[in-house]
Amino acid sequence: MASAAEQLASRFNFGALARAEELKKRIWFTLGALIIYRLGTYIPVPGVDPVELARLVQQNSTGILGWINGLAGGALGRMAIFALNIMPYISASIIIQLMTSVSPHLEQLKKEGEQGRKRINQYTRYGTVILAALQAYGISVGLEGQGNIVLDPGWFFRISTVITLTGGTVFLMWLGEQITARGIGNGISLIIFSGIVANLPLGLGALFELGRTGQLSTFTILGIVVGGLAVIAFIVFVERAQRRLLIQYPKRQTGNQVAQAEKSHLPLKLNTSGVIPPIFASSLLLLPITVANFSQGQGPDWLNYITALLGHGQPLFIALYVALIVFFAFFYTAIMFNPKDTAENLKKYGGFIPGIRPGERTAEYIDYVLTRVTAIGALYLAFVCVLPEFLTTFAGIPFYFGGTSLLIVVSVTMDTVAQIQGHLLAQQYEKLIKRTNLRGARR
């Protein structure tokens, strides 16, 4: 709930942070890695005219190209070596996770612990290279079909672009893993977060420029700012929201001692699937455009027609976007949370839900509650992701942040702050244990 977020903020101790040497090293490592990433977004791919490319990006700033460029921190607009960002890795991760539910081999690897996880991660890396190479080739062919952007079109440009962009994605994948292991927070999420936030000053500058020139009134600008803050507060509230199921454990007798009955809760997050559904839905909707780039606009008429209908902000795009978000919210929740396994574990340790028979009935009840919670979470995701699209397309109100970007920024911020708080608590416990041991030794 929102109170949990307030509690987290109130307990954040900046004095303890200043004394936490290990945590400060992790934070400095994370900042250094993100600086390297940002520098890479300014190293251009050879063979591209930056002036013509900037013109193309400006013409498509409110379309699909602008949306991808925003997630990449402007790297795509500069055709930098990190133009693909980490998106191929995310797509590969999602595909592997979805395949785990239908592939017996991957399902078995998932149950093998650390070794199985390493194998699955290796498959994800292979998938990342394949997807990055395909997307890089699609971009190179698409640029060649856009006039004078490519200085020397041909196979040499295509191959060099594929190698450069794929190498950039692989490096970002490695950098994200290093941040996760040696820094603070989830490395992949922080890379996307930094790319989105890096363009925030430009977006705010463009908004206030519209106000200065009189294209937007002061009241409209104030409404956009207040509305954005309200959406952020709404995201924080929902991301913290839980449906708690009461779990009871019977009295236990150990020797002559009888332990009292215990109570606990099984928390079901309102948004169990996180930001995965909108990201994967966007990836699927980008597929026709990628295929169209391969054909350089000379493909069949039906493909060009579908590509036009799926343009950013088109009614069909919005309708399919909502449908895919809802579908993947349910699908991914089913992968992340298994009611049968949860019911079996409760029965194994003697836990039960009051009024519900342990075993199959408990699994059915958990699935019943989870389905309704997921429905609310799916509608929440669809609302947040489509609201900026709807206001931009039909009301003419400019929004710098898309709904997916807002979800990523807020979720990553909350997770990173929670991890920092966890490190501070662990340090305080270590100091408390040391003091207790010293007092015991003195006695």
What spans do the regions from the language model cover?
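N-terminal cationic and glycine-rich segments that engage phosphates or anionic surfaces
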Residues: 2-110, 115-443
